[in-house]
Amino acid sequence: QINIIDAEAVAEYVKDNGIDLVYSVGSDLAMPTVAKVSEKLGLPHFVSYDTALTCNLKHKMRVALGNDFKGNVPFKVIEKLEDAEDFECYPAMMKPVDSQGQRGVHKVESFEEIKENFEKSMLYSKSGKIILESYLEGQEISVNTYVKNGKVIFALVSDRVSFKEFPGGIIKKHLLPTQFSKNVVEKVKDLVQRVLQKLEIKDGPAYF
């Protein structure tokens, strides 16, 4: 058994077994390891280690997009409760910066609700950091996309249905085809293209 976030152990296993390609199809958590090992051993890979890490850490992705990026939202990274006292962009989503599967995610309407849920979110943050993101009202969607030479060549937009009884937007199902108009879908594809360019993802699959 090898821990998938232990890049050194994975690299040794790859070398010892003459493996030609390292990839993960089921875990976001493994993608920085995939990129780091592939770079170290000169194996084929879609994105750099820096890009994989940025995509894996919510605060790094927000920073990489930049405050002037059309489609980004107001956000703040906090490590202690006092850091959130001047946050004003409510309602907001409170998330551990480095968790997956909606663990530790809560919608908050005030600083009082941040206090109520702070420790619950922090339980799932390995780095001890939480991000507050201004909440966007509306129908949720997902996008499965593939990019080649910096251009999106495939993008499938689906409607996302979340469990109402759980916090954090845990996905219940995806619906196809999307209910949105062709015009809206084209705007979504444009946003996806711009995000991929900002994150320097030039080849391979991506999911939003």
Predicted regions and their residues:
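Glycine-rich phosphate-binding loop signature in dinucleotide/nucleotide-binding domains
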Residues: 13-19, 87-88, 124-126
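Conserved N-proximal alpha/beta basic substrate-recognition cap immediately N-terminal to
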Residues: 2-75, 79
